[in-house]
Structures are given as structure tokens and as C-alpha cells.
């Protein structure tokens, strides 16, 4: 599966806006906030953001895949990365390269 960079940015922005302090953002709440992406795209993106240490997630492996239950937090590195890609005009320049 291909990593959708716009989905990556949007997941981080939505997580930042909707994650409560000392709480989590369930996948069931995240999906409706990102209507432009499929469940598979969002799940894959969350797994890759976790792999890159930008998000901490709660996940459950099952035969044939992994289920993402919740986003637990944006890591410090995730916040730093998000600050670098937050500006829409800068983001457009980055993804055009």
C-alpha cells in the first residue's frame, strides 16, 4: 500500500485538535473526521506514523493484519514534525518536490 502524504498530515492535524489530555482518540471517532480517506488509508497511515515515532497508538494484531484501536498521543517528534508542515502553502511546496 502506498503512504498518502496528505493523509499523514491530516491525521496529525486532526489528532492534535481532538486528542484530550490523558485520553485517547478512538479510531471510530477519527474516521468521520477524515471523510476524504478510506479506513484502510487511515489505518495504514496511523501504523506508519507510529513506526516513525510520530504517534503512539494502541493496536491489536489479528491473523492477517493489525487493528488500530486508538491514537494515544502525538509524540514530541510528532509535534515538531507537525510544526514544520502545518502551513498549507509550505506543505504544497514540500509535496511538489
PLM features per residue range, with description:
Residues 5-9, 40-43, 52, 72, ...:
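Non-catalytic, well-ordered alpha-helical scaffold segments
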Amino acid at each position: 500500500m502506498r503512504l498518502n502524504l496528505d493523509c499523514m498530515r491530516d491525521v496529525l492535524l486532526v489528532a492534535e485538535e481532538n486528542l484530550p489530555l490523558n485520553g485517547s482518540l478512538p479510531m471510530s471517532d477519527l474516521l468521520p473526521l477524515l471523510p476524504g480517506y478510506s479506513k484502510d488509508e487511515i489505518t495504514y497511515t496511523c501504523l506508519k506514523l507510529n513506526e516513525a515515532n510520530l504517534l503512539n497508538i494502541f493496536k491489536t494484531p489479528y491473523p492477517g493484519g493489525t487493528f488500530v484501536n486508538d491514537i494515544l498521543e502525538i509524540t514530541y517528534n510528532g509535534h515538531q514534525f507537525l510544526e514544520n508542515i502545518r502551513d498549507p502553502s509550505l506543505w504544497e511546496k514540500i509535496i511538489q518536490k
